[in-house]
Amino acid sequence: SQTMPQVLFTWHGGETLMRPLAFYKKAMELQKKYANGRTIDNCIQTNGTLLTDEWCEFFKENNWLVGVSIDGPQEFHDEYRKNRLGRPSFVKVMQGINLLKKHGVEWNAMAVVNDFNADYPLDFYRFFKEIGCQYIQFAPIVERIMPHQDGRHLASLTDKEKATELADFSVSPEQWGNFLCTLFDEWVKQDVGTYYIQLF
């Protein structure tokens, strides 16, 4: 019922590739059925570990944009990005990225900045350039925690105002500010128009 000429579907939340490929094929059938002349675009966010040739062929054929969650070089990424068995995931993510590149799929990177990696903005940035990523998003992680009778837990949306302590992995305001300033200084001198950072 919308009158806009273009509609963007953003597939996000949890791990999107846990859904079978048939789910997204059906979604596209429904998009085409109800498009009524509008342009339909799709983008999807994934941790990249489940990417296969089949997935990448689908994304390429249907012109999907793929966002990959990768927190920089291996030593940064593997600090917090573990699989369900608690094992590091960097190698699998890079295998997925290489498949996207092999099939010519348009992709970008989403990186979480935390207490462990926030002091190394240039290592982050140069890594993404080395792997051929032209579009980069950086997101600071700040999680509040609540005291609890059996320990501490992350605050829900309803009790955020009562939570005054931050989780240990949260990035501090000073770290985030320094991260952005250092990153901007290098980007503006060398890479404007070649590499794209969402915040700039």
Can you name each region flagged by the protein language model?
Residues 16-66, 70-76, 84-95, 99-100, ...:
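Canonical radical SAM enzyme core domain
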